[in-house]
A protein has these predicted regions:
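N-terminal secretory signal peptides that target proteins for export/translocation
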Residues: 1-2
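Residue-level signal for mature regions of secreted extracellular proteins and peptides
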Residues: 11-12, 133, 186
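A diffuse structural propensity rather than consistent per-protein peaks
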Residues: 7, 122, 241-242
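Gly/Pro-rich turn-and-neighbor structural signature
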Residues: 115-159
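Sec-dependent N-terminal signal peptides
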Residues: 5-13
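Short, conserved catalytic or interaction motifs in soluble domains
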Residues: 20
Length: 307
């Protein structure tokens, strides 16, 4: 049921911020207010947090509003990782961050600082928790369908996240709506305190998802570049259409093996593409759009569909 709720939310919750609904407000030290709404049924209650302002202010509002959940979720995630595998040591996580730092959007860095201050949690620990997916091997799945492939012609973008449930991240779901002073408003479904993005959508109708493909035998990975989860946050701020999103992927220095699913839900430019990032000898990027059927692969075997 939780997965179904999150899927539906990605379609419509963005519009909550455009109308007045009942909820709670939390005013921070700068006078900026985070609005909190809830979607719930008999078994599940998910907070929808609307933040606004600069990246630091939005991070602070989010951290202050979800303080208890951030501490339990992110510190628990880090603790489990470090207890279960020595590769999640402080040294390894710090090394990944340091190598990627030249490529990380300063807006993400500032939001992370604000999140740590608002939630009153160690910035170092919060940063290390964000590096766990970067140095991990995992696989997910996704699909985008539109036009003749759907009953009503609308675009539907589906994303499945294959994280371990032992970390109990699923116990702390949160929907965050960002209304930045500069940049495109956007939304992401995540876990309390995790502000990198594995799926999200911006107000221009651009939707993001991925499938991991880096096997554990290739560990340790090369971190001299940008991880998709941080690149997605930049794209949410700046990508206004499918072409601009793909251009940002092409210009980025990418790391590891991934399938990146990007779709555009606007009627006039509706469509999707899959970007395939392959390593480790060298980073190779291949981008396929609808109706392109690469020889020898099973990609894009149906019209108006990428998966």
């Amino acid at each position: 049921m939780l997965k179904r709720i999150l899927t539906l939310l990605l379609v419509f919750v963005f519009f909550i911020s455009c109308s007045e609904r009942e909820g709670t407000s939390t005013e921070n030290h700068d006078g900026k207010t985070a609005k909190v709404f809830y979607v719930e049924n008999s078994t599940t209650k998910i907070p929808v947090v609307v933040v606004s302002g600069t990246p630091y202010e939005m991070g602070f509002q989010l951290g202050e509003t979800t303080k208890d959940e951030v501490n339990k979720c992110m510190l628990g995630f880090l603790e489990l990782g470090q207890q279960s595998d020595e590769k999640y040591s402080d040294a390894n996580l710090d090394d990944a961050w340091d190598k990627m730092l030249p490529y990380i959007d300063n807006r993400f860095i500032e939001e992370l600082k604000g999140l740590a201050d608002g939630a009153e949690v160690s910035l170092d620990k919060l940063r290390r928790a964000h590096m766990i997916p970067v140095i991990s091997s995992f696989a997910c799945s996704g699909v985008a369908v539109w036009g003749d492939a759907t009953a009503n012609g609308d675009l539907y973008h589906i994303r499945n996240l294959d994280f371990t449930m032992d970390a109990h991240l699923q116990d702390f779901p949160v929907i965050v709506i960002y209304k930045p002073d500069q940049g495109i408003p956007h939304i992401q479904t995540s876990f309390a305190g995790y502000i990198a993005s594995h799926s999200g959508m911006n107000a221009k109708g651009i939707v993001f998802g991925e499938k991991g493909a880096s096997p554990s035998k290739e560990y340790p990975y090369n971190y001299d570049g940008i991880h998709f989860s941080l690149l997605f946050r930049t794209m949410m701020y700046d990508a206004s259409n499918l072409e601009s999103a793909l251009d940002m992927i092409e210009r980025a220095k990418l790391i590891k093996r991934y399938y990146l699913y990007i779709s555009d839900g606007k009627k006039e430019t509706m469509g999707a593409a899959i970007a395939i990032v392959t390593t480790p000898d060298e980073v190779k990027l291949s981008i396929y759009k609808d109706n392109e059927k690469p020889e020898g692969t099973s990609l894009n075997v149906m019209d108006n569909c990428v998966y």
